[in-house]
Amino acid sequence: MIALPISFTKNSYNGIDNVFFVNLLNLPQIDTDLTPYVVLNIEEPKHYRIKEELKNIFKEKNIVYSYHKPFPYTKVSKLVKNGVIVSDNPMDYLLLYRNASEVYSDRVHACIPTLAFGNKARLFSNSPRIALFENAKIPDVRERLVSIEGLKEMQDKQIAFLASLLQ
């Protein structure tokens, strides 16, 4: 992160990532034949061992696999045959995470919407983006399955700050 002189940051607010606001979309909760289900979104090869361990842990549960990385269309049929959800439409992923009971991922932006929708998530990553969880008061998202508390208050404070700039 770059520290800017105060003259450049007069109207800055050190708030939560905008993805923590997806719950305001009011996406429906949908019961399916898989409900409840766990999402495994482990894409990095260095985390495949973790993915296999999670598959064993949840073998008695309904598991849905998702894939976020851009993909060549030649690879899509292979992913789909293996039961992996892939999409060009972010809403598909948001609906998936809205209705999951738990999400285990090495992608920050699989965990954030899950938490915003009130579900539990755990992150397997050392990305600098982990800092996004600190402002949301969930710094231990890499150590255990977590949920978020006080999200509405954090959202309201950030919205109030932005509204004050428009007055």
Task: Report the location of each language-model feature.
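Active-site anion-handling motifs in enzyme catalytic cores
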Residues: M1-Q167
